[in-house]
Regions:
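ATPase nucleotide-binding head domains, primarily ABC-like/P-loop NTPase cores
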Residues: 1-170
């Protein structure tokens, strides 16, 4: 998507971003810098493009996906699961769907701060393992946001993953 933007900001002066799917994306930056907005913009534009043939961008080339998976705002199910358990369950659900479909299907996934409900060391390790597992599937594209620089460093020179960083002006 060339110069895509978040539709609810249509009447304002939205920041436009270009998003390509030649490699999977890992986006790092501080809170309130727009990471989640890029995820939402991309998935909204993907759905609009596939369903209606247009979206909120200057131009786009879209190779349709058969499955779109979202890991945003995982609820802490009070009294039942910890946040970490809820996050792990959601990751497993996504992996099960990917694993159980044939390789002709295409999957697009957005992950907003994997395992934010646990300590940084375990979260980083779990996030790295999750990304590593996804890499075995050529039919899966993803955008992942994170605060963990260890995840970014691990995939710094990876052939299927590109790191991005959002700067914040204070």
């Amino acid at each position: 998507f060339d110069k895509q933007y978040y539709p609810p900001l249509c009447g304002e002066n939205p920041v436009c971003n270009t998003c390509t799917f030649s490699k999977n994306m890992i986006i790092s930056s501080p809170n309130k810098s727009g990471k989640t907005t890029i995820l939402k913009s991309t998935v909204i534009n993907l759905i609009f493009s596939q369903q209606f043939g247009y979206g909120f961008y200057k131009s786009a080339f879209v190779n349709p996906y058969t499955h779109i998976h979202s890991y945003i705002n995982i609820p802490d199910t009070s009294g039942r699961d910890s946040l970490f358990q809820a996050e792990s369950r959601r990751c497993k659900e996504i992996l099960d769907i990917i694993h159980d479909t044939d390789c002709d299907t295409r999957h697009f996934c957005i992950f907003d701060e994997l395992y934010s409900g646990t300590n940084p060391v375990e979260a980083s390790n779990a996030g790295n393992a999750f990304i590593q597992y996804l890499q075995q599937y050529n039919n899966v594209n993803f955008i992942l946001t994170t605060h963990y620089t260890s995840i970014c460093k691990k995939y710094k020179n990876h052939k299927r993953v590109q790191n991005y960083k959002m700067d914040v002006i204070i």
